[in-house]
Design a protein with these regions (language model features):
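Nucleotidyltransferase catalytic core that binds NTPs
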Residues: 1-179
């Protein structure tokens, strides 16, 4: 199935049929700003839990409220396009709220997946999914991968001017393109 960016209503229509046909719908969500291998492995694990993987994506406005000024680094449409291009992802739904509760309560996936950094009792949508007969699964985090850590590394290595502050190895020199 080709991945698509859908509205919540489109996803309910499209994947409601899949559920009626016995296909298991899996849902996960996040900001997914600066996608890294930890995210990819999480999507792959989530996809293995069912037949269809839908990713809820925080809008730019909700990311700013959650993460602060300067975020997201990648605009929502571009983040959605990147996610939709992944083989493991069947659809992407952008949502404006701070949490995906409304999306989850309307979509009612068979499986709700979150990263292992979320305590089980704090996973938004848990009650709705379990009340509808679904289950909630925490997937393990991949060590050494974090968007916040990547951003910190960038900040430490580059000053406000964008020039690399780290010393260059001896003998290295910057080159300029010819005019």
């Amino acid at each position: 199935m080709n991945s698509a960016n859908l509205t919540l209503e489109q996803a309910i229509l499209r994947f409601g049929r899949d559920k009626r046909d016995g296909r298991r719908v899996v849902f996960t969500n996040g900001c997914f700003d600066l996608l890294h291998p930890g995210h990819l492995r999480g999507f792959e694990l989530a996809r293995e839990l069912g037949d269809v993987l839908i990713v809820g994506l925080n809008s730019d406005a909700s990311v700013r409220q959650l993460k602060g000024p300067g975020r997201p680094v990648i605009p929502e449409r571009e983040r959605a396009e990147i996610l939709a291009a992944l083989e493991s992802v069947d659809a992407v739904i952008i949502f404006d709220e701070l949490t995906p509760r409304q999306v989850i309560s309307r979509l009612l996936p068979d499986v709700l997946v979150k990263g292992g950094d979320w305590p089980g009792d704090q996973i938004v949508g848990r009650e709705e999914v379990e009340a509808a007969g679904g289950r909630v699964v925490s997937v393990p985090l991949v060590p050494d991968y974090s968007t916040s850590a990547i951003l910190q590394k960038i900040r430490e290595g580059f000053g406000p001017s964008g020039v690399n502050k780290k010393p260059q190895p001896e003998g290295a020199r910057a080159t300029r393109p010819e005019s």
